[in-house]
Regions:
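Bacterial N-terminal signal peptides
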Residues: 2-13
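Disordered, acidic Ser/Thr/Pro-rich linker "stalks" and the adjacent N-terminal cap
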Residues: 16-72, 90, 94, 163-186
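Lipid interaction determinants
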Residues: 137, 157, 165-223, 234-284
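A short beta-strand element within beta-rich, extracytoplasmic domains
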Residues: 75-93
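Short beta-strand/loop motifs in extracellular/secreted proteins, especially
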Residues: 65, 75-78, 100-102, 198, ...
Length: 284
């Protein structure tokens, strides 16, 4: 069963809808695993493998927890293929919570999806495609597991465009922990809360894109692309055509005005201009 709630129609020209490469998956929380830090990381939800899953790690049953999935160019999503729960084994599936209802949204539209309580993959056709670069998968209701952890898990949400998976098995083997870089991957925003003018995307393939989009039409914008590396402590950036620059990256959690958690990334470097060296938030 699929219930689609259309808030505003977003129509992009067909020429603008590139087959965007997968960019990142960023979660509001993940279940900690002492011996394997990447065991329940958000990238597991897009690799198309039953042996891996994302499990949220917030207090409660997981309702309201989310994963933001980003692409490196605009895409049109007309189908998702969902494998519910922790599907690596029947025991793990029954022990952990599964998702009963989730929402899939972009900035302007939202679909509500009701799932079955099964380990088998479920194909969900979207009545109206979602278009853009950034999509949010959010847990709305759960099937309660038999274990004590009370963690809700999703094994896979594969995004499909015109019958072609844009995430899934093609990414298997490419989505390791990245030496802690998974904590930085995602879209970051700088400027007034709710009205940012600067955007920084850090992708799983170790590339980045920075954009300055001023509200003043008389002021020129800016775009910088390049590479980044992060070993869990030291951040290095290489804007296209320039040398590598060492920077510090401080990541911390804080609360926003609406009471929901947000992450704050502060990048500082002597040889990096103010475009990139500033304070960033993972929420607009």
């Amino acid at each position: 069963m699929l219930t689609a709630i259309l808030l505003v129609s977003l129509l992009l020209p067909a020429s603008a809808l590139a087959k965007g490469a997968f960019g990142y998956a960023r979660a509001s929380s993940q279940l900690e695993h002492d011996s394997r830090p990447a065991r329940y990381q958000p990238l597991n939800m897009v690799d198309g493998r039953a042996a891996t899953s994302w499990c949220e790690g917030a207090r409660g049953d997981g309702v309201g927890q989310r994963i933001v999935v980003g692409f490196q160019a605009p895409v049109s999503i007309d189908e998702v293929r969902v494998t519910n729960g922790e599907a690596s084994s029947r025991q793990a599936f029954k022990a952990n919570n599964r998702v009963r209802v989730l929402t899939l949204s972009n900035e302007l539209a939202r679909h509500t999806v009701t799932l079955s309580d099964t380990q088998r993959p479920q194909e969900i056709k979207l009545g109206k495609p979602l278009e853009g670069e950034r999509f949010v998968v959010e847990i709305q209701e759960v099937f309660r597991g038999e274990g004590e952890a009370n963690a809700t898990c999703l094994t896979d949400v594969v995004f499909v465009s015109g019958g072609k998976p844009l995430s899934g098995p093609s990414l298997a083997g490419k989505l390791g922990d990245r030496n802690g870089a998974v904590a930085l991957m995602g879209s970051w925003y700088s400027g007034l809360e709710g009205a940012p003018e600067r955007f920084l995307d850090l992708y799983f393939d170790k590339t980045f894109r920075y954009r300055y989009q001023p509200f003043d039409p008389e002021e020129p914008g800016e775009e910088i692309r390049g590479e980044f590396a992060f070993d869990g402590k030291q951040l290095r950036l290489k804007p296209s055509g320039k040398e590598w620059v060492e920077a510090s990256a401080a990541l911390k959690a804080e609360e926003s005005k609406d009471g929901l958690p947000r992450a704050r990334l502060v990048i500082a470097a002597e040889r990096l201009d103010g475009s990139l060296a500033r304070s960033w938030s993972d929420r607009p």
